[in-house]
């Protein structure tokens, strides 16, 4: 069975507190969602603002393969705004629970039904595909839902949706509810789950078992309050655990996750299922030993299947085999005696409560073996100008030993650190395609001259390195960390 994916990252996802996308941001995400293979892109709510309509129009003009949808209330003015944007469909939402009808709408069931049907008729008269959606359906009278959906079919609704608006479903109740609705409604039924009790993915999958044929999801599970059902979790679970297919190109899940994270400025939790950096990370010696022998011992799927990668983390729980495996992955050969010394230093770091980054491990290797990692690109000069009413600007002069050339570049930024890193990245762009994946400041002591610890993650192709640097000067610490990471990737 093929399950359709209705992505609402650009509507429900953008309603995450603190998130606001520009029209161009919306377009960039929509194009990636289309490449990913979603069936429907809910591009926003056209009535919201002029900027929202501009973003939706950019998407509809792009000629994407996905159906482009706008959220609307059961109001002609909302539908008119959607029509102005030239969308393919509307997600027409009607509150159906007693608490919503009494306190929000101040209407009876009959009045709500009449309003909904008139709105469906109006949208259909104007050539739109209509998905009639019951808001707070899981706290509604199921017989009223069935009546609404069947009456909606009579006036032209194309499909219907059951919304678990406040996330109160359980997997068992979800399957039972959708079984009853699909047995009594002819139209295709969608499921829309929120994650207030952490069960959005499970409830969505159970709804499919009950007969739902389309899942509403968001990338990274973002959304209001605790978020929505996660696209990557739902798609992977349906495929691997239940045997249902979708059109999603699963190998692109990690990439799309990071694009949404960057544009929405919402970091992906390391332990996030499927796309988190720790989703396929291993530290415990027993686990790594099993992994080396057969990856299926501690991984339910191969990370490459979802565009992620396996990571071996070193710390106090690591064993010698894990260390040797990590060094082999990094292309570092050491003797047994050197391996034992490196292992002891790793344990010392771990007992001090320190996480050992790739750069830390290389530093330990250099200390034990006396071998230095070749510095292929050297920072010769760094100048940063910043201040009140001055756009931060930085210039760098680098020496690339590989071709014995000097690289000089200037770049602006939203702050002096951003400007400095942008200048370095711009300077090396002709040498290698290296992307900054993550930047954070982890430890700040007291006082204005305190040491600051900066952590950066850089990516070259599928390789990612993490570097930590400490300095009283945050700009210097940041640039040093980036430079060390670049040299690690070039080696």
Curated annotation (Swiss-Prot):
Tell me the GO molecular function terms. Answer: (R)-citramalate synthase activity; 2-isopropylmalate synthase activity
Record carries keyword Transferase: yes
Q: Which InterPro entries match?
A: 2-isopropylmalate_synth_dimer, AIPM/Hcit_synth_CS, Aldolase_TIM, Citramalate_synthase_CimA, LEU1_arch, LeuA/HCS_post-cat, LeuA_allosteric_dom_sf, PYR_CT
- Give the first-level EC class, as a single word: transferase
- Which Pfam families does this chain map to? HCS_D2, HMGL-like, LeuA_dimer
Name the Enzyme Commission number(s) assigned to this protein. Answer: 2.3.3.21
Subunit notes for this chain?
Homodimer.
Q: Which family does it belong to?
A: Belongs to the alpha-IPM synthase/homocitrate synthase family.
Question: What is the protein's known function?
Answer: Catalyzes the condensation of pyruvate and acetyl-coenzyme A to form (R)-citramalate.
Q: What is this protein called?
A: (R)-citramalate synthase CimA
